[in-house]
């Protein structure tokens, strides 16, 4: 059966009959239940962690998917360990560096305010509402206005996820600091990937990973597929899981290399 290794939160994307591949999902260091470790947070290090996982599982090669920050790691992994990659799926991400489109300054400030206020137990209801709208996109909000509601007097992400232990909630609150990692980007290396690649973006992702980055990615990777989802924001994997499952299945079945089957 074909095997897909991913780093992303939307595991429900692969539940049900729309996706017919075996999927391995894991938490990178410092995320959810994975320990922080002693090594610095860099994309090359996280890529090496992924390679180590494959080695530990005795999986020589797999299809790789990365969503958002995971897309950075997936690119770094494919560049540094091409022998372990069959195909590449990049969702709501960027190749970074000088060619990448950065987050708007006002959005970076908003993210920083959420982290700082939540750590000091200051209500962040309005800030989270703004983040939520940015994540979902204006088109989705118009179709589903109820999804923009945030409980009043929310002071941390843990309140939105009551079952989340405080230490894990704090890790997630500080996740934005990861993006300050000294990463020069992968735009100048994309042409060397030489792997069948699918790039997916929501057309309303204007803040987290501006959707123009997907066009840049697709233009730099030879033969890349580009899919733009209307009325979808950065949360495209949560908004259109069935549609994305079908798109990925089509890509994986159409571009299937001879050595992609793992028995």
For the regions a language model picked out, list residue spans one by one.
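Conserved alpha/beta-hydrolase catalytic His-Asp/Glu region
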Residues: 124-173, 177-184, 188-189
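Active-site loop/oxyanion-hole signature of alpha/beta-hydrolase fold enzymes
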Residues: 24-65, 69, 80, 246
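Flexible "cap/lid" loop of the alpha/beta hydrolase fold
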Residues: 79, 86-123
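Conserved alpha/beta-hydrolase "acid-adjacent" motif
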Residues: 206-213
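Catalytic active-site module of serine/aspartate enzymes centered on a nucleophile-bearing elbow/loop
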Residues: 221-263
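Hydrolases whose catalytic domains are alpha/beta-hydrolase-1, hotdog thioesterase
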Residues: 73-77
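Conserved HGGG/HGGXW glycine-rich cap/lid loop of the alpha/beta-hydrolase fold
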Residues: 1-39
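Short beta-strand/loop motif that positions the catalytic acidic residue
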Residues: 193, 199-202
């Amino acid at each position: 059966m074909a095997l897909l290794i991913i780093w992303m939160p939307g595991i429900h994307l692969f539940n049900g009959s729309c996706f017919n591949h075996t999927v391995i999902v894991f938490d990178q260091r410092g995320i959810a239940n994975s320990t922080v470790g002693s090594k610095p947070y860099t994309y090359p290090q996280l890529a090496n962690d992924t390679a180590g996982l494959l080695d530990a599982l005795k999986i020589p090669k797999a299809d790789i998917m990365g969503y958002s920050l995971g897309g950075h790691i997936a690119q770094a992994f494919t560049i540094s360990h091409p022998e372990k990659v069959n195909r590449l799926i990049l969702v709501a991400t960027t190749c970074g560096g000088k060619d990448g489109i950065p987050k708007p300054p006002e959005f970076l400030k908003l993210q920083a305010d959420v982290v700082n206020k939540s750590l000091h137990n200051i209500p962040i209801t309005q800030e989270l509402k703004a983040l939520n709208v940015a994540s979902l996109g204006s088109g989705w909000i118009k179709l589903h206005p109820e999804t923009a509601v945030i409980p009043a007097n929310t002071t941390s992400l843990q309140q939105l996820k009551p079952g989340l232990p405080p230490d894990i909630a704090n890790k997630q609150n500080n996740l934005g600091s990861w993006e300050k990692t000294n990463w020069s980007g992968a735009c100048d290396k994309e042409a060397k990937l030489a792997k069948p690649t699918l790039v997916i973006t929501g057309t309303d992702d204007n803040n987290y990973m501006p959707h123009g980055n997907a066009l840049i990615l697709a233009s730099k990777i030879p033969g890349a597929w580009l899919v733009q989802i209307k009325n979808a924001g950065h949360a495209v994997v949560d908004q259109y899981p069935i549609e994305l499952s079908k798109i990925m299945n089509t890509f994986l079945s159409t571009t299937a290399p001879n050595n992609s089957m793992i028995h």
